[in-house]
Amino acid sequence: MEASKVFFTNMRVKNGDNLLKKLDRLMRAAGIESIDFDKRFTAIKMHFGEPGNLTFLRPNFAKVVADLVKEKGGIPFLTDCNVLYVGKRTQAVDHLNVAAENGFSPASCGCPVIIADGLKGTDEALVPLEGTTYVKEAKIGHVIMDADIVISLTHFKGHEATGFGGALKNLGMGCGSRAGKMEQHCSGKPEINTELCRGCGACKRACEQDAIVFDAEHRAHIDQEKCVGCGRCLGACNFHAVYSPNYVALDELCMKVAEYTKAVVQNRPCFHISIVMQVSPYCDCYGGNDMAIIPDVGMFASFDPVALDAACADAC
C-alpha cells in the first residue's frame, strides 16, 4: 500500500505574506482542487470554542477554506454537533450564540453556521458500519451525513482522555450526536483513589455534571449515575487521585472515535486540515485554556486523517 501524503507549511512568514495566504497555498498543494465542489454542499467541521477559551482556531482560517470552496462552485457551511456535558454548547441556540460570540458568522467566515445534530442534539443519522470492533451503527449528526463533501478543520492540541485531539477526534467524537458521544464515552468512567485525594475540590469544579461528592472526611467520590465519562476530572487533579479503573477503556474510546470517523468519511470526498498552534494541554471544550506546552509548529493537510494525525503528533 502506498503511503499517504501529508503536506506541511511552517508558521513563518515573510513581509507581504501571511498565514491565511499560506493556508490557501497549502490546501491547493495538497490537492483539494481535485474534488468536484460544483453545487455540492460542503461541511467544514470545526470547533467553535467554549466561552472563555481562546485557543480555538480563529474564524479567519475558516473563511480561507470557505472562500476556496465557493471559488470552486461549492456551497460551504461551518458545522459542529452539540456536546454531551453540561455547558454552553449542549443545544443549538446556545451553541450558535457561542459561535457568534467567538466570531463565527456569515459576515466573518463567508458562510453560515449550522449545528449538525439539531436543536437538542437528537437529530441524528444512523450509519451502519462493517468490519468494526465496537460500533456497528454510528449515530452521526444528520446535517453531517446530508453533506456531499466533508472538510475537517482541526486545532491540534492535547486531550485528557485520548492523548491528543486531532482530525480523528474532530471527526469521530465531534460529528457524533449527543447519543453518539455517550456511546463513545460510556465504556470508561473515572474513579477516585481516596487515599490520594487531598479534598482540594479541583475535580468538583471541573465537573459540569455535579457528579463529584465529598464524604465526611472530605474525600471525593464520583456518582457513577451522573458521570458521563468526559474525563475532565482526570485533567483537573494534580495528585493523581482520579484514574481510569480500566485503561483498556481509554483504548476502547480511541477505537470508537476511529470507527465513528469511518462512518463520517466513508463513501464521499473528504479533505483534512490540522493547525498545530497554541497547543494547550487539554481540549478546547474547557471554559479556559492553559498556556501552550510547545511552540507553534505549522499547518498540515491531507486526504488521509490517520496519516494527518500521525504527522502532527510526530511533529510535536
Region spans (language model):
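Terminal amphipathic helices with adjacent charged low-complexity linkers/tails
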Residues: 66-67
